[in-house]
């Protein structure tokens, strides 16, 4: 028996008050639907079917990299109708698991428990007990605790509304069962929809075993209906990430002011992360790294014993061991800092390698530049890499000393151990071991007086 997963993602999401389809809104930097797909893949299904509707072409365009089978539900007539669109693509002997594109934190542990504890010919649902179950379907049991049916909130009687055990919507049974039950559904209810939950009563009526598996926590089965629910779930997720990292030996100064936006974040023990830090995409931090407040790291690797000072923004960079960056530094894609390099305040780099032990301490732009070892780049230095049409490369060889307020008009090479005088504008190569100065000689004009204002 193989496993087919059906993810229902066709809801309109009106309460999000957004032109973006609900399932494309991110949680922890990843779209809601993608999170559910990633979890489903951990179960090793042979196929993942996604039933989409609202904003369909936009959803497929944005998430076309996902390994799923897309099925359009042109009319949103309820969850039962949505599953009916996908079930013809499932083999009769398949075990079918039904998930929801707006329930992003469901855990593989709970899903495995559901699959393992549901008889091969039975039906299983994930249930949860909530302090306030308003708006959610209730689990109806007999005196022996057996599940009899699920009643939606709008269709529930007064005594049923007092029940706190709710249906999460997550369900598993065989494809053969669904092919038998789904055509029997009707829309004789308050919402005039075909409810998937009505299959529970059909299963009970024919003696099919029905069981429930409890969710580990309320948050893992929390659906996202509006921005506020998404915000609360985001904070819960970030606290989970902070706790996971802390238990692995990372110091998170304030878990309430920490954001991890991506699933490929690897942080070694003894790293210290200050407040308002955002880690996005693929981020790797080695031992003893210190990240100051208000730092953004995206798709970046940082070597051991390196310190990133406050308010630095770093994207797609490689920073090796024992480096110092910032405060207020910006490293753009393609930046590489070799071991012991230093980038100070208000320095911007792009497609530039700063060699071992080299430093650019202040107020500098380095673009399309290869810098060797033990180079000093003075304050106010600019590599002029763009001529209005093309980018050109600058090379600064080992041991060079670049004075303050120097403009290097690429393409050019500054030779090994060369010294460039402050205020120079170079448009030709500077030879090694020599002082090169490219500026007008200072002169004083005798007898000159400042102009005076006319009366």
UniProtKB/Swiss-Prot annotation:
GO-annotated biological processes: cell morphogenesis; cell wall organization; lipid A biosynthetic process; peptidoglycan biosynthetic process; regulation of cell shape; UDP-N-acetylglucosamine biosynthetic process
Pathway field: Nucleotide-sugar biosynthesis; UDP-N-acetyl-alpha-D-glucosamine biosynthesis; N-acetyl-alpha-D-glucosamine 1-phosphate from alpha-D-glucosamine 6-phosphate (route II): step 2/2; Nucleotide-sugar biosynthesis; UDP-N-acetyl-alpha-D-glucosamine biosynthesis; UDP-N-acetyl-alpha-D-glucosamine from N-acetyl-alpha-D-glucosamine 1-phosphate: step 1/1; Bacterial outer membrane biogenesis; LPS lipid A biosynthesis
Gene3D superfamilies recorded: Hexapeptide repeat proteins, Spore Coat Polysaccharide Biosynthesis Protein SpsA, Chain A
Keywords from the named record: Acyltransferase, Cell shape, Cell wall biogenesis/degradation, Cytoplasm, Magnesium, Metal-binding, Multifunctional enzyme, Nucleotidyltransferase, Peptidoglycan synthesis, Repeat, Transferase
Molecular function GO labels: glucosamine-1-phosphate N-acetyltransferase activity; magnesium ion binding; UDP-N-acetylglucosamine diphosphorylase activity
Active-site residues, Swiss-Prot/TrEMBL: 362
Residues annotated for acetyl-CoA binding in this entry: 379, 385-386, 404, 422, 439
Binding site for Mg(2+): 102, 225
CDD domains per the UniProt record, alphabetical: GT2_GlmU_N_bac (cd02540), LbH_GlmU_C (cd03353)
Bound cofactor: record note: Binds 1 Mg(2+) ion per subunit.
Region listing for Linker, in residue ranges: 228-248
Reactions it catalyzes: alpha-D-glucosamine 1-phosphate + acetyl-CoA = N-acetyl-alpha-D-glucosamine 1-phosphate + CoA + H(+); N-acetyl-alpha-D-glucosamine 1-phosphate + UTP + H(+) = UDP-N-acetyl-alpha-D-glucosamine + diphosphate
Pyrophosphorylase: annotated segments: 1-227
Family designation: In the N-terminal section; belongs to the N-acetylglucosamine-1-phosphate uridyltransferase family.
Assembly notes: Homotrimer.
Protein name: Bifunctional protein GlmU
Originating organism: Coxiella burnetii (strain CbuK_Q154) (Coxiella burnetii (strain Q154))
Gene it is expressed from: glmU
